[in-house]
Amino acid sequence: MKPTRLSYALRWLVFITVWSWVIAQPGAPVVTLGSPQVVQTRNPKAGVHTRLTDEAAPWKVQRTLQLVREMGAPWIVEFFPWAYIQYNPQTFDWSHADEVIDHARAQGLTVIARLGLVPWWARPDERVQPTTFNYLDRDHYADFGDFVHAFVEHYKGRVQHIIIWNEPNLSFEWGLRRVDAAAYVDLLKVAYQRAKEANPNIVVLAGALAPTLEPIDSERGLDDLIYLQQMYAAGAQDYFDALAAHAYGLTRPMADPPDPARVNFRRVELLRQIMIDHGDAAKQVYITEAGWNDSPRWNQAVKPAQRIEYTLAAFDWAQQHDWVTMLAMWAFRYPRAARNYQDGWTWVTEDFQPRPIYLEIQQQLRMTNDK
């Protein structure tokens, strides 16, 4: 049966109706950097570890960083994966990294860039050798060095601090291999030299060691105190400007004294002593991950009120120690809720609702009530 004029009219009416509905929907917000902002704070060492790596929407990137500024924290640590930026060997995609860094700077924030995560072309064939995205063999150290050089050169004048790798004293972060401090130092040397070629004034942070008590024969990792000693023994001293450290309190209060036999926030003081013992007292420590979890679903968490108390004390502690440049708490916000105990680390929900810890820390950090 041939279409009638009525059927044509109905089809046209449906098309117009649907199209009108589509164009009436609100589009993505137009995001501009806006006028430069200044962080108002009582504590110039306060920071947070943001997780914008997988945040696709520009307005969400901007809003996250606005909330950091409004809280009164002038520092952020952010991950810039090699695997994302140099997905193919010959090309670099700076678009998302530019977005994060430019918005952070517009909010008056100082960015510490954590570099790592190996692209597919620099990892073993997973069909032959199953591993993680953190596996990098010596044959590709130069490739990582080239990436570090490109990153530092691209962000000269915008990023002044980089962290080389993350928690290399854990097997998972070393590609499911037995950890190797000497191999990490070799990687650090390559990265340091290439970074300084691009910008002699860049601050290269080493370590970012996970606080752990794993013994020397463990397949899971190695005690961070032992690992740092091994780094010095392997000649690391000449290839980093400052130490990145992780300071998690678990169930212990901030004031719990440092002890080599347990993990607590002040364990970082033991790392500092190792630096002093090796003649590195002049170097600073940047605490790039830290904090307490307040999830009721995890046996290593604390109550929300305890988390607030310990965090307030930790920021005060940082101000009292001149060898600490900054203290970044994990983790400000996840792009998507984890729906498990990991959400107990966050300060702001995925839909930008401040949690109680945000509001309490904001009250401590802000110099005025103006936003």
Language-model regions: role of each:
Residues 71-216, 250, 281, 334-338:
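Substrate-binding cleft and catalytic face of glycoside hydrolase catalytic domains
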Residues 141, 145, 179-308, 338-341, ...:
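Noncatalytic carbohydrate-binding groove/subsite architecture in carbohydrate-active enzymes
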Residues 21-74, 79:
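Boundary/entry segment of secreted carbohydrate-active catalytic domains
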Residues 55-70, 143-151, 221-233, 308-316:
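Short, acidic/polar
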Residues 72, 149, 155-160, 227-242, ...:
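Structural recognition of alpha->loop->beta junctions
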Residues 44-50, 76-78, 111-115, 162-164, ...:
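Hydrophobic faces of well-ordered beta-strands that scaffold small-molecule active sites
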Residues 46-60, 129, 133-138, 219-221:
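Acidic/histidine-rich helix-loop elements
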Residues 7, 11-41, 46, 95, ...:
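Aromatic-rich peripheral "rim/lid" segments of glycoside hydrolase catalytic domains that contact
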